[in-house]
Each structure stands twice: as structure tokens, then as C-alpha cells.
């Protein structure tokens, strides 16, 4: 499952580094410089991982910083949705 997701994202030049996938945001402050990807147990599906790991790559590309404004957050979210849609269309 995760190998397929990582291979797809690599085609789009998204190479996630130093991350942990967790079902809870309780670990956020413990992570430090490591990206934390939150996926609820019932939501652990390929297309959701594509979306969330894409956000991790966006975070890496931005110098490990979250979106600095609502507009930036919205742009990142729209981009992640487009990447997820591409994955879903190719998976059919």
C-alpha cells in the first residue's frame, strides 16, 4: 500500500523525508523537526495517504513551515486535492 503511494508521489517529484504517520495529533509537539502525518485508523486508504503525504512534501518545500496565511493553506489544500484526484483517476 504505502509503496504504491510513495512511487506515485515520486513521479510528481514529491520525496517525503523524516515523517511519521499517526492516528492522533497528540504526538505533534514531540516530533520536533519530523513531519507528522495524521490519518485516522478508518481512513488509512491509498488516496488519503497520497493527499496527506503530499501535504508533507509541501511542508518540506516551504522550509518545514506550515502555511503562513489562509490563502496559502487554501492553495496547498487545493493542490493536494488535485494530486489525490489524479491518483484516483489513474487507479481506476
Question: Model-derived features: where do they sit?
Answer:
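Glycine-centered secondary-structure boundary/capping sites
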Residues: 10-14, 62-63, 92
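Zn2+-dependent metallopeptidase catalytic core
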Residues: 1-17
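Post-HEXXH active-site segment of zinc metalloproteases
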Residues: 32-34, 42-43, 47, 59-90
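Short non-domain terminal segments
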Residues: 6, 26-27, 85
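Short intrinsically disordered terminal tails
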Residues: 1, 89-92
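Active-site scaffold of zinc-dependent metalloenzymes
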Residues: 14-46, 56-60
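Histidine-centered divalent metal-coordination motifs
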Residues: 51, 55
Amino acid at each position: 500500500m504505502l509503496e504504491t503511494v510513495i512511487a506515485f508521489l515520486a513521479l510528481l517529484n514529491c520525496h517525503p523525508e523524516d515523517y511519521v504517520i499517526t492516528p492522533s495529533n497528540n504526538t505533534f509537539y514531540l516530533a520536533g523537526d519530523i513531519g507528522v502525518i495524521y490519518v485516522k485508523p478508518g481512513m488509512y486508504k491509498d488516496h488519503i495517504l497520497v493527499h496527506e503525504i503530499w501535504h508533507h512534501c509541501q511542508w518540506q518545500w516551504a522550509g518545514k513551515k506550515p502555511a503562513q496565511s489562509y490563502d496559502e493553506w487554501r492553495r496547498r489544500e487545493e493542490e493536494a486535492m488535485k494530486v489525490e484526484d489524479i491518483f484516483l483517476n489513474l487507479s481506476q
